[in-house]
Design a protein with these regions (language model features):
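Exposed boundary/loop context
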Residues: 3, 12-13, 27, 43, ...
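Short, well-ordered alpha-helical segments
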Residues: 75-91
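Amphipathic, charged alpha-helical segments and their helix-to-coil junctions
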Residues: 36-74, 78, 94-129
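Bacterial N-terminal signal peptides that target proteins for export
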Residues: 2-23
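Sec/Tat signal peptide C-region and signal peptidase I cleavage site
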Residues: 22-34
Length: 129
């Protein structure tokens, strides 16, 4: 697992920005980055309201019993798609499935989550951090 963490950290051309929500290259920011920044702001606000949270699988999810707006769901989907692309790229050539990278990131995201936000643990339960 330590080797995978080192490998995952070694992907300098990609960065998970502010909670793993956006992909950028080190060379330049693009309009896609601006779109993901907007999605991040929407997601951060929804996290603060307790509508969505980080999951151990490396993706954002809707907290049980909550009904986020279409805008929040779209932003969450946009970020999850970007995360999947990062996990897939990290896995390419590593001999490991993308799910390994997703779970490593999920653990980090949960650890970095702000107090008072919801996180979904390995047992599938949402808990307020």
């Amino acid at each position: 697992m330590a080797t995978l963490k080192t490998l995952f950290s070694g992907f300098a051309a990609l960065a998970l920005i502010a909670g793993g929500s956006a992909i950028i290259t080190l060379a330049s920011a693009t309009p896609v980055h601006a779109q993901l920044s907007s999605a991040k702001a929407t997601v951060d606000a929804a996290k603060a309201r307790g509508e969505i949270g980080e999951q151990v699988d490396g993706y954002l999810g809707v907290v049980t019993g909550k009904s986020p707006s279409t805008a929040v769901r779209n932003a969450m989907s946009e970020i999850n798609i970007a995360r999947k692309a990062v996990y897939t790229k990290a896995a390419t050539g590593s001999g490991q499935p993308a799910t390994v990278f997703a779970q490593l990131t999920g653990e980090k995201q949960i650890n970095k989550s702000a107090q008072g936000t919801y996180v979904k643990d390995a047992t599938g339960n949402w808990k307020k951090k």
